[in-house]
């Protein structure tokens, strides 16, 4: 597993890897849109890309292509708000990406819905993320602190597996897994293991990384423990042909 010490290393080396080692794939769908036969949506793809990010001193390289940190911060607030918001307000800061996916004023799903769904923990009602925080407080060694995003939607009584045909959008994120473990110095820290089925490198990866890191910091703070590392697995990490020129552009140049 590749270990990155900062977001600049992550973004610059991953861009190069996709360009040099990505294999071409011609997908038929993008979210809930049909793109079959559209040349600009041919992808370069890396399968089961895995890495560990150990520090987030400067997040700006994560937004080098999107300039979307304001959206990411607003989106994060909605995700931990305790309210199952749909569509919320954060999407308005990135209308160019999200507006086309509104259906009768709502999205097919939101992370705020999936993360704040009410569940029962030891006989009491909590949001899904709230239950995980309570579990981590009482059992530092647990392997059950999994915040699933993909799967059943208790709010709409839906199941993502019903929409494999593309009728609705389904989450690119599978789950976040929180593990409290000792680091090399013998200090307990809360790590986050983030598994995605799919991530668009140019349009979404930087946001995905930032939001996962913020989530780790938030849960660590609520539990009262030091935040640790992000372990990230992406089954299909890809870039669309319309964005390939950005893979060959120096990120340092883009940051200036």
Where are these predicted regions, by residue range?
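Terminal, non-catalytic protein-protein interaction segments that mediate quaternary/complex assembly
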Residues: 1-256
């Amino acid at each position: 597993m590749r270990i990155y010490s900062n977001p600049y290393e992550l973004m610059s080396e991953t861009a190069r890897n996709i360009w040099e080692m990505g294999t071409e794939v011609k997908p038929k769908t993008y979210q809930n849109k049909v793109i079959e036969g559209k040349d600009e949506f041919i992808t370069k793809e890396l399968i089961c890309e895995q890495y560990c990010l150990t520090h987030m001193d400067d997040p700006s390289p994560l937004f080098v292509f999107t300039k979307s940190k304001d959206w990411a911060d607003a989106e994060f607030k909605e995700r931990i708000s305790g309210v199952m918001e749909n569509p919320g307000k954060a999407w308005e800061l990135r209308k160019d990406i999200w507006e086309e996916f509104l259906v009768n004023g709502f999205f097919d799903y939101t992370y705020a819905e999936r993360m704040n769904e009410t569940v029962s923990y030891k006989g009491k009602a909590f949001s899904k993320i709230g239950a995980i925080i309570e579990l981590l407080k009482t059992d530092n060694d647990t392997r059950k602190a999994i915040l699933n995003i993909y799967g059943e939607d208790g709010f709409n009584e839906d199941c993502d597996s019903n929409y494999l045909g593309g009728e609705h959008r389904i989450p690119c994120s599978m789950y976040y897994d929180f593990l409290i473990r000792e680091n090399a110095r013998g200090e307990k820290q809360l790590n986050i293991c983030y598994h995605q089925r799919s991530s668009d490198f140019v349009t979404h990866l930087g946001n995905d990384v930032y939001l996962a890191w913020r989530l780790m910091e938030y849960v660590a703070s609520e539990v009262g423990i030091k935040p640790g590392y992000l372990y990230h697995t992406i089954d299909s990490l890809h870039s669309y042909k319309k964005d390939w020129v950005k893979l060959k552009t120096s990120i340092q140049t883009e940051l200036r």
